From Swiss-Prot:
It holds the Pfam family DmpG_comm. It comes from the Bacteria. Keywords: Aromatic hydrocarbons catabolism, Lyase, Manganese, Metal-binding. Belongs to the 4-hydroxy-2-oxovalerate aldolase family. Residues 5-257 form the Pyruvate carboxyltransferase domain. It comes from Mycolicibacterium vanbaalenii (strain DSM 7251 / JCM 13017 / BCRC 16820 / KCTC 9966 / NRRL B-24157 / PYR-1). It catalyses: (S)-4-hydroxy-2-oxopentanoate = acetaldehyde + pyruvate. Its EC number is 4.1.3.39. Mn(2+) binds at residues 14, 196, 198. This is 4-hydroxy-2-oxovalerate aldolase 2. One of its GO terms (biological process) is L-leucine biosynthetic process. The keyword Transmembrane helix does not apply. Substrate binds at residues 13-14, 167, 196, 287.
Amino acid sequence: MTTTVYVQDVTLRDGMHAIRHRISPRNVARIAAALDRAGVDAIEVAHGDGLAGSSLSYGPGSHTDWEWIDAVAGAVTNATVTTLLLPGIGTVAQLDEAYRRGVRSVRVATHCTEADIAAQHIAHARELGMDVSGFLMMSHMAQPADLAAQAKLMESFGAQSVYVTDSGGRLTMHDVRDRVLAYRDVLAPSTQIGIHAHENLSLAVANSVAAVEAGATRVDASLAGQGAGAGNCPIEPFVAVADLFGWKHGCDLFALQDAADDIVRPLRDRPVRVDRETLTLGFAGVYSSFLRHAEDASARYGVDTRAILVEVGRRGLIGGQEDMIVDIALSLSAGVP
């Protein structure tokens, strides 16, 4: 039986973290058009923290979500336009507006133990007729059976697929496999499973492959790995590996390579790679989007970024607690344990 993979590109959503959510609609349209020509199944677009994520806490966007969504919707003919929504940040009204502008798929994201807060948004998206996924962030912080129970909740609300979301790039291949298999044990056969990997431990492609081998059919990836921390699963090597395995997908490898090298890499103000800071994210199990916040605090208060990230991991901070990074930096600079 041939394995078919649904490839969703996240360059224009998770990738926003890598460029501080600052990109022109023109460049968004260029990237979206290139991805569409390259044959990806879906293109996710929004502020890095989802609809309405632009703020002082998460980082202000250079443009509105609507400008970016319009740019993507106007540039694609085949790929599904997708967005991300975090309940408590994005609202049902904003989901309606995204739908009006051409978004037909949404991932409703919560912390891995808080699926219950997604009920209203998932149900409303289904009422709109959207393709709806549950997105359990920081999946390394819950054991497989506990995570699967949260996935089952999202399914009960109406999610048609649920993701193992390795926001901290902390999972190993065995960890991913165990979580996907735990999902499969409790979810209906018709409910798809997805994987969202980060490269902080240099395992993004390997983890995505392990997930597919365990039964996942949806894979997040991005051009040149554009994403928070050391980036997401780089789409070019993932597609190359998928070809070697004989998996079915619609992507043109050379077209993806061209888009990555000619369009995306030149837009960066910081290399997206495994280095001493991003490796620390994975090792300490820290939310990948905390990287730029920690680097800013390091520069301001004269504290090693790695020390900040290790303390963030020790405290178990999660998305939405970005303000605590400054508190940690101040404490470390004052020698307070």
